[in-house]
Amino acid sequence: MAEAGTGFLEQLKSCIVWSWTYLWTVWFFIVLFLVYILRVPLKINDNLSTVSMFLNTLTPKFYVALTGTSSLISGLILIFEWWYFRKYGTSFIEQVSVSHLRPLLGGVDNNSSNNSNSSNGDSDSNRQSVSECKVWRNPLNLFRGAEYNRYTWVTGREPLTYYDMNLSAQDHQTFFTCDSDHLRPADAIMQKAWRERNPQARISAAHEALEINEIRSRVEVPLIASSTIWEIKLLPKCATAYILLAEEEATTIAEAEKLFKQALKAGDGCYRRSQQLQHHGSQYEAQHRRDTNVLVYIKRRLAMCARRLGRTREAVKMMRDLMKEFPLLSMFNIHENLLEALLELQAYADVQAVLAKYDDISLPKSATICYTAALLKARAVSDKFSPEAASRRGLSTAEMNAVEAIHRAVEFNPHVPKYLLEMKSLILPPEHILKRGDSEAIAYAFFHLAHWKRVEGALNLLHCTWEGTFRMIPYPLEKGHLFYPYPICTETADRELLPSFHEVSVYPKKELPFFILFTAGLCSFTAMLALLTHQFPELMGVFAKAMIDMFCSAELRDWNCKSIFMRVEDELEIPSAPQSQHFQT
């Protein structure tokens, strides 16, 4: 009984759904019936005669004006559609029709099981897309005072965008502050300094924090029962204040290194004290986490200073020690600094060892990892590689491995080859990058172009093979080959990260859809005809008549030729043959 009741309810439900689906036809016939019944009270016949009289009295100028107005409106719609496509990469009309009109017209599948399966199947790719569109801190970022500001002084251009600097301010607040900073006056001042937008205000706050720490406290130490001496003890220095001054006030790398060494002394003392107290409560644990971030940042920047000043082996040692001491702090991506320094030393065996550790499927990829792996593979065959010889005898196993590594790197970031091959000019890299985007390509090529030039034939091999990647992934936004589909958000994020004077590289190249080009041509042609007809009505009439006569005469000529050939064939009894043979005869 229960099953019978359930079946009856399902049938009733399906009947109701069917009736609502075709209810609009019923309404249509009802409206027609009402119009027929009310034709006399509504005076429909009189109204129709009035409308026909009005249409008969219209002059050709009205139709010309109507055509011109419609062309103007179509042109405005076209301009808006083109602007929307350039900004967002999709058609506004297509997006509205797919997103809003299609559900109303029943284009969405109502099967919940299919929707759930598809959503579960796409969840991994969606998460990967979100992670790839995340903005990362550039591990090879330059110094603001010693490098970025000097570029501004020379060229008058700002190499950093407000969005990029705002992200850096957020990073500084995350790494260098904690909830207990208000207990120490210097840290409280620095907590406000990291939020300042004005560089001079930040520098003044850092000096103020250091001046507060110059206050001396006297500690009474009894030596003899009858006498005491006074020992002068300095309060611990503020390491974050030295960091800010080294980053923004120092005008040379040498000055920045001196300030970072002072910051290292202060930061190392704070780190040791907080390490002993970290288990006494959550507050001390937060302080220790902050002091750890400060110490790692200082040591990494000191290693980068040594690398800039030519002491590359010292920089490599500092980076290796830092990675051994803090192996879990992967957010700074110190291994990318190490790879660049090892390539400068031409220690390719050590580079391969680092890649074997970090070029893992479970770790996030980067342009540095992918292109460095491609450089090592290309180094083995690039000096003897020749496109002509390869086309004759085919690629060897080593050459095939090198080409596959290049294709893998190009698929991950297709913008890099244009900078390595110097097809696009380089600019100073931003402080933040978007993986697989133009910003990451600039950051990589800025430091690694010299390493590719040093390997003989590497750029030649890259030039001959990098475009072959795009044949394997004809639709990169929908499906990738070795990586996930290329994220759509890279262009928008790169425009926020890179300065306005740089032309952002876009992949894949967006081409205007055919219907936009067709609409543009049709609107332009119609508007031109309307304008010419309005200005020169007699001349356009003669032109139109001449075009019609020419078209009709061409049709008649073809018909006459065909009829003549058919009569000749009938009289001579010639078998049917292609028309070209008749003309030859």
Swiss-Prot record:
GO cellular component: membrane
InterPro entries listed in its UniProt record: ST7
Chief location of this protein within or outside the cell: membrane
Signal peptide per UniProt: none
Regions that span the bilayer: 15-35, 62-82, 512-532
Bilayer topology term: Multi-pass membrane protein
Cellular compartments annotated: Membrane
Location of Phosphoserine modifications: 386
UniProtKB keywords: Glycoprotein, Membrane, Phosphoprotein, Transmembrane, Transmembrane helix
Residues annotated as glycosylated: 47
Assigned protein family: Belongs to the ST7 family.
Protein name: Suppressor of tumorigenicity 7 protein
Species whose genome carries this gene: Rhinolophus ferrumequinum
Organism classification: Eukaryota, Metazoa, Chordata, Craniata, Vertebrata
Gene: ST7
